[in-house]
A protein has these predicted regions:
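Bacterial N-terminal signal peptides that target proteins for export
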Residues: 1-10
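Intrinsically disordered/low-complexity terminal segments and short unstructured peptides
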Residues: 5-6, 15, 132, 152
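Bacterial N-terminal signal peptides
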Residues: 9-19
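Secreted/extracellular ectodomain signature
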Residues: 24-233
Length: 233
């Protein structure tokens, strides 16, 4: 005879417990993102998701700034390491000329280069275990699955823009279909042991069935639409 009453009491107790648990869950603070206020260099952990269409230099710079802000380094002026080619009367822009003078350090405080000359020499410390993301993470390279080592730069080994004509910037970072972008290798490795394969900023042009600039195209050759960000000030 007491079974319905017992069942009701148990149900009420369970409901009360669920309410308390829900309230406690709502009071839990959001996980704190890792902070690196002294960071002045990183590789984006992900791209905006539209292949090599970064919204031009302005969009890429804003993306760098947003990622840095999330991890405590937003007080600096961030620039994407990207060149653009001369077109429609607009002059070319060199990645070399837009990222400040250095020195630059990664999430962990490791110096990646002391100056522009150092950065564009064999003395720089860039590589898979040093070129970390804004979260302090390593980007997988050759030998890992997936391989994401291609980094968009549109630049020569000296950090300069390519001459007008053959596209090397996916239409100055506005195309996610036709075109091609020069990429570097974050891990300094490739299919061959040559200077291009070991280059952090000028290894090979992107390519693929969609035209060369889509997210799928970039992934097909070992990329993911990632790019370097430097604090210019």
């Amino acid at each position: 005879m007491n079974k319905p009453k017992t069942t009701l009491v148990a149900a009420l107790a369970l409901a009360s417990l669920c309410v308390v648990s829900s309230a406690e869950a709502q009071q839990q603070p959001a996980p704190q993102l890792p902070q690196a206020p002294n960071m002045t260099f990183f590789v984006t952990s992900a791209g905006p998701g539209k292949g090599a269409d970064l919204g031009g230099l302005e969009g890429a710079d804003q993306y760098c700034q947003q990622l840095a802000q999330r991890h405590g380094a937003g007080g600096k002026t961030w620039r994407a390491y990207l060149s653009t080619q001369a077109v429609d009367g607009k002059p070319a822009v060199n990645a070399h000329d837009r990222i400040g003078k250095g020195p630059w350090q990664n999430f962990k405080g490791d110096i990646v280069a002391q100056s522009l000359d150092d950065l564009h020499s064999d003395n720089n410390k860039l590589g898979m275990n040093v070129s970390l993301t804004e979260r302090g993470q390593v980007i997988p390279g050759v030998g890992f699955a997936p391989n994401r080592h291609d980094v968009l730069t549109g630049s020569t080994p000296e950090g300069k823009a390519f001459p007008a004509g053959e596209d090397r910037t996916c239409r100055n970072w506005t195309s996610s279909t036709q075109g091609s972008a020069m990429v570097g290798h974050i891990d300094r490795k490739g299919l061959r042991d040559d200077a291009a394969s070991r280059s952090w900023n000028s290894s090979h042009p992107s390519r693929g069935p969609d035209g060369g600039c889509s997210q799928a195209d970039l992934r097909s050759t070992g990329g993911d639409g990632l790019f370097y960000c430097f604090a210019a000030q």
